[in-house]
Amino acid sequence: MGSAGARPALAAALLCLARLALGSPCPAVCQCPAAAPQCAPGVGLVPDGCGCCKVCAKQLNEDCSRTQPCDHTKGLECNFGASPAATNGICRAQSEGRPCEYNSKIYQNGESFQPNCKHQCTCIDGAVGCIPLCPQELSLPNLGCPSPRLVKVPGQCCEEWVCDESKDALEELEGFFSKEFGLDASEGELTRNNELIAIVKGGLKMLPVFGSEPQSRAFENPKCIVQTTSWSQCSKTCGTGISTRVTNDNPDCKLIKETRICEVRPCGQPSYASLKKGKKCTKTKKSPSPVRFTYAGCSSVKKYRPKYCGSCVDGRCCTPQQTRTVKIRFRCDDGETFTKSVMMIQSCRCNYNCPHANEAYPFYRLVNDIHKFRD
């Protein structure tokens, strides 16, 4: 009985060795280009089958081989068909990946598509992730650009910033800084204002933001007012989701969006089994045993005992109150490793203010990020 069960596994191993032997041989010494290849929007870099060089990952229905692997972060694998001697295949979605529905259309797991000219999206195991193709529209122009405005360019999809160089606009800009900050205002004083300068049509105005970062920086830019918003709510009320924030804490002082993996609670978690007598809520629960985080088919190298938010019996919802962000290394089946930011819950709170987090609305839309779509 045992020998019969081992035969399929042995045959699969021999088939894999045959494919490796017939495939392109790996060089004795790795020789890679000095510069990394430029990939299309939404396409990441992955190591080739020899573990030598970074190459652009092949996408759904594209040709693949040992030296041109598929994008495993999107649930794709190289399908060589039934021939054991095949060295080239086609990128197909793994069988366990779920399709996605977007705008009444069905997309297969791992399939990339453009819903419009400004976004590139990918279906990842039932969730849709999108990246902007017009990054200049997301960031503000330099402060030295008077009366900026976004204008349409003939023949192009993305709008571009233009500056009004008129004398009146320059005087308005100079008067703004003289009045609001004073000409001798230090960079530290500007940072403590905890305000972000927003340049809008018709002039400039101050917008409050949340959670300003400490003033000390690895880089110094005297013209940059470093500000960072709070993390958004997790895109899922159970299971793995995404949380985002906006910051200009970078050498270019450009507004960028950062993401982190989050999990408010595991799906299928018993809601009220652990409630003590007379209690209506379970705020924070710790994982009973060490677990590995999962992301895009890959698992964390180490095990953790994270805290989760509980639930209530009186209609209130429990959401994270205090969190921290840690860097966690993930490893995939092919040996590839990468690091992602992950939310760690420190405490939760329960209240009746449940926008998009009520159990009656299990998913909500998070623009330009991984989310579930629901009509």
UniProtKB/Swiss-Prot annotation:
Record bears the keyword Phosphoprotein: yes
Domain annotation VWFC: ranges: 98-164
Cystine crosslinks: C26-C50, C30-C52, C32-C53, C39-C56, C64-C78, C70-C91, C281-C318, C298-C332, C309-C348, C312-C350, C317-C354
Range of residues in the leader sequence: 1-22
Membrane-crossing residue ranges in chain numbering: none
GO MF term (any one): integrin binding
InterPro entries for the chain: CCN, Cys_knot_C, Glyco_hormone_CN, Growth_fac_rcpt_cys_sf, IGFBP-like, IGFBP_CNN, Insulin_GF-bd_Cys-rich_CS, TSP1_CCN
Any single biological process term in GO: integrin-mediated signaling pathway
Residue span, TSP type-1 domain: 223-268
Induction: By V-Src.
Annotated region described as Heparin-binding, given as residue ranges: 274-310
A GO term from the CC aspect: extracellular space
Alphabetized PROSITE patterns for the sequence: CTCK_1 (PS01185), CTCK_2 (PS01225), IGFBP_N_1 (PS00222), IGFBP_N_2 (PS51323), TSP1 (PS50092), VWFC_1 (PS01208), VWFC_2 (PS50184)
Domain CTCK: residue ranges: 281-355
Source organism, top-level taxon: Eukaryota
Residue ranges constituting the IGFBP N-terminal domain according to the UniProt record: 23-94
Main location: secreted
Subcellular compartments: Secreted
Keywords for the protein's UniProt record, in alphabetical order: Disulfide bond, Growth factor binding, Phosphoprotein, Secreted, Signal
Function: Probable secreted regulatory protein.
Family the UniProt entry places it in: Belongs to the CCN family.
Name of the protein in its database record: CCN family member 1
Organism, as annotated: Gallus gallus (Chicken)
